[in-house]
Amino acid sequence: MKTALTIAGSDSSGGAGIQADLKAMTMNCVFAMSAITALTAQNTTGVSGIFEVSPEFLAQQIDAVFTDIRPCAVKIGMVSSAPLIETIAERLRFYKAEHIVVDPVMVATSGSDLIASDAVRTLRRELFPLAEVITPNRHEAEVLSGLHISGRADMSAAARAIAADCGCAVLLKGGHSDTDADDLLTFPDGTEIWFPGKRIANPNTHGTGCTLSSAIAANLAKGFALEEAIARAKAYLTDALNAQLDLGRGSGPLDHTLGGVGVENWMHGVPDAVHK
């Protein structure tokens, strides 16, 4: 069985963070493991507290995983401080980790800040160069590129700037658009691939970014090329949104079980182009 590791924060409400990561990875048929960067007191209405682990303890968790069940892919989510980012980068370089997906989580769905401003610079310097792909949303891409994004041309310019600066592929997510959910994959050489997506009428989007990046990592772990891994991950996320789970008083979580259909039934429904 293929394996994947998520390095991210814990969401006490279960909708985002490592909880969403583990669910998404499991539904995409890999053995999922975790190293926790922080505990958050969080629900669908906001984040009321963040308790970081120490860099030393984070390193211990990563060591425990790599020295026993080596992950075939690694997803990195919420890392709120520079020392933790530096620790992750050092350990991943030491173990020569493969198929690294970085979701540069900066703001929760509820609007709460999740990363210190100085940590963004460290993220760019230490982790992005190790990544196979990073998965910013529109707001995160604006921070990383310094450009305002209001349409497809802006998405293209921002993604090209980030990819050239960081030396890795960039999947700029279009889910914050008012008209569609098209995502743009851009490589450092300027090659672009658009992934069309249908906007789903569902206000409950807590954990969508975590879910997508974890599903991408899971499919990279299974040996799919990046473009294919993204297509499969988008298909899974779309179905999780379409399940229309409605929990909590704010922006609620996704249904990672896809309405209880089970992974085998879901996989039978994935288009042939995605299976191949």
Q: Predicted segments — roles?
A:
Residues 7-13, 192-206:
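Short pre-catalytic strand/loop immediately N-terminal to key active-site residues, enriched for Gly-Thr
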